[in-house]
Amino acid sequence: GGAPAEVNDQQWRNQIRLYEPAEGIYIAPRAPTNNWNLWHEGHIDDLFDRLIENCVMLAGVNPDKVYLMGYSAGGDGVYQLAPRLADRFAAAAMMAGHPNDASPLGLRNLPFAIFSGADDAAYRRNKIAAEWSAKLDDLAKQDPGGYPHRLNIYPGLGHWMNRKDAEAVPWMANLTRNPWPDKIVWHQSGRLHDRFYWLALPAGTAQRGLTIRATASHNTITLDAPGVPRLTLRLHDRLVDLDQPVRVVLNGKTVFDGKVNRQADAILKSLQQRADPHSAATALLDVAEKTGGE
């Protein structure tokens, strides 16, 4: 980042040649700008959404088999993008990057690989790779079943890892996205979003630093959402049995207990938001905190 356009163009051409996966389609996009934060800017999220949609609709790509990886400045972007776009991908691999202010909280359901040369000391990339893996270790201990990850630090190698990091490709190819996980951790950072897995916020209400923890178990959905007075549940029979009553507990209080009807409009609205048929809701339920004597 921050380099002249011709330097970034050359690096882009290098990335095109870097991997030749037999497992599927490999796309190496060029960042739209030459700023220092090439892959951190807000428009990048929209770029990837559109790119994924085009691949699904025009190239027959399975939306549950889409993967994210990036090298150097691209690795910086993976640190940033993977947690906040975790519901789009089946796995992510970060190579030789730096997270800056990224948070790993959103990676609860996204297998995440970290690759670094042991001698890649610039900006402490090697040390921070190990520190981020330790953060994921701690999160996984606190949340069994969550935060799957792996760390590869190659002795004797610096910023260039002699393509050893290519082992990420077959590792990712064996993984499949679950668009309806029974537990979600949604943390707002960088670019704000109003939809994540089976949760949605009213437009314009997302705030940086906001964290929502949601669990679905035995047709009860429990939401720990401090500072969130209302939100929408995007439901599907892969998450709850819509033939049975659904109970919703928001911030410790039951705010709904009853049947939720399947709705064609829910499918339409989901697909209008994102051309991702596997994550399309079949029912929508708006819930709000109870106040006063309610």
Feature annotation, model-predicted:
Residues 5-12, 37-41, 79-81, 103-107, ...:
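Short, solvent-exposed loop/turn and secondary-structure capping segments
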Residues 8, 44-51, 74-81, 85-88, ...:
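Stable alpha-helical elements in mature extracytoplasmic
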Residues 90-173:
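The feature captures the conserved acid-bearing segment of alpha/beta-hydrolase catalytic domains
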Residues 1-57:
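Active-site machinery of serine-nucleophile hydrolases
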Residues 21, 53-60, 83-87, 137-142, ...:
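Sec-exported extracytoplasmic/periplasmic mature domains
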Residues 3, 7-8, 64-108:
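Primarily recognizes the serine-hydrolase "nucleophile elbow" in alpha/beta-hydrolase
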Residues 137-294:
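Alpha/beta-hydrolase-fold serine-hydrolase catalytic core, especially in secreted/extracellular enzymes
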